[in-house]
A protein has these predicted regions:
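Residue(s) in the substrate-gating loop at a strand-loop-helix junction
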Residues: 85
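Active-site-adjacent segment of SDR/Rossmann-fold oxidoreductases
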Residues: 90, 111-121
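Substrate-binding pocket helix/loop in short-chain dehydrogenase/reductase
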Residues: 42-43, 50-52
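C-terminal helical subdomain
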Residues: 125-126, 133, 142-182
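The beta1-alpha1 cofactor-binding region of Rossmann-like NAD(H)/NADP(H)-dependent oxidoreductases
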Residues: 5-16, 48
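Active-site loop immediately N-terminal to the catalytic Tyr-X3-Lys motif
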Residues: 44, 92-96
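Active-site helix of classical SDR
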Residues: 66, 101
């Protein structure tokens, strides 16, 4: 096990993490870009700082992650997976920054998939709906039992990795089976 700390918004830190990983483990076969945060509010209320924080973390961080691992993934014919959101195709009031970032992640990942599959690199994006996490200060509890659980996304990733190499699920939408009880 190798634990590293890096800010996804800092390309140099991403590159340093890749070098440390390759030095310790030898190669990089799988990359999962899963950093994300949300700043919500109407376009009138969202600040420049809030906007930049969301875009730099959720979208630019995904770009930096792929860019810094690309040569490694080419060598191993690896797999690059992004965790986007259903907010990457479904907009909502108060979601200007978050929607823009997740629409961007979805589009970026799909375009990268077209660019990289000719190199033998598989690229997929998983677009979950409501997931029981600590996102934006939420404390998972019984009230979140109806939501997708973190381990469900983990199982989905494992399923992707087990698929026959000739098959590429490029964009996967996943949502809770049942809506919340009112």
């Amino acid at each position: 096990v190798l634990a590293l700390k890096a800010d996804v918004r800092d390309y140099q830190q991403q590159q340093d993490a890749v070098k440390a990983t390759e030095s310790s483990l030898g190669s990089i076969d799988i990359v999962i870009a899963n950093a994300g945060l949300g700043v919500f509010g109407s376009i009138e209320d969202i600040t420049i700082e809030g906007w930049n924080q969301v875009i730099e973390t959720n979208l630019t961080g995904v770009f930096y992650t792929l860019k810094s691992t690309l040569s490694s993934l080419k060598k191993t014919k690896g797999y690059y997976i992004t965790i986007s959101s259903l907010a990457g195709t479904n907009f909502f009031a108060g979601g200007t920054a978050y929607n823009a970032s997740k629409f961007g992640v979805t589009g970026f990942t799909q375009a990268a998939m077209l660019d990289l599959r000719t190199h033998g690199i598989k690229v997929s994006t998983i677009m979950p709906g409501s997931v029981s996490t600590y996102f934006n200060g939420n404390e998972p509890s019984q009230k979140d039992a109806w939501k997708i659980q973190q381990e469900d996304i983990g199982e989905l990733v494992v399923d992707l990795l087990k698929m026959n190499p000739r098959t590429l699920p490029s964009k996967i939408e996943v949502r809770p089976s049942f809506p919340p009880t009112k």
